[in-house]
């Protein structure tokens, strides 16, 4: 069940899927691999803790890292989908599910801590993200 949110669209996050209220029957019924379920739960937990329940800015370095990783995940989910072309004016790209899963896991584990958050915005796969980061530096 996918829920779209106007406030997410106003932030120019497309597709404007609200991960707080959206659910996957495939994950809930165990139709996906265990790794997929675990990574999806970790992503949801990090996004909820770092972006949706934020009160004061994080003080500890670990908290700041978690918020930055959550922002990278949020931006990574703005992959240039074909259905979003009318809104983003960017051509759609295809990212394989296993690549998306591994990239999410690697973001959570800090493997891309050296890549700026903005490099993940409307990027396709991790190679495009790395190329953007290299072009900025």
For the regions a protein language model found, what residue spans apply to each?
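Conserved catalytic/coupling modules of large nucleotide/cofactor-utilizing molecular machines
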Residues: 1-137
């Amino acid at each position: 069940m996918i829920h779209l949110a106007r406030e997410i669209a106003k932030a120019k996050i497309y597709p404007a899927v609200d991960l707080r209220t959206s659910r996957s029957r495939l994950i809930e019924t165990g139709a996906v691999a265990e790794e997929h379920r675990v990574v999806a739960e970790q992503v949801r937990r990090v996004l909820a803790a770092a972006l949706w329940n934020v009160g004061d800015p994080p003080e500890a370095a670990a908290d700041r890292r978690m918020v930055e990783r959550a922002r990278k995940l949020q931006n990574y989910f703005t992959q240039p989908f074909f259905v979003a072309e009318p809104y983003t004016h960017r051509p759609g790209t295809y990212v394989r599910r296993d690549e998306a899963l591994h990239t999410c896991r690697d973001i959570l584990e800090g493997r891309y801590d050296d890549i700026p958050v903005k490099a993940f915005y409307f990027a396709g796969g991790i190679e495009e993200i790395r190329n953007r980061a290299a072009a900025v530096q």
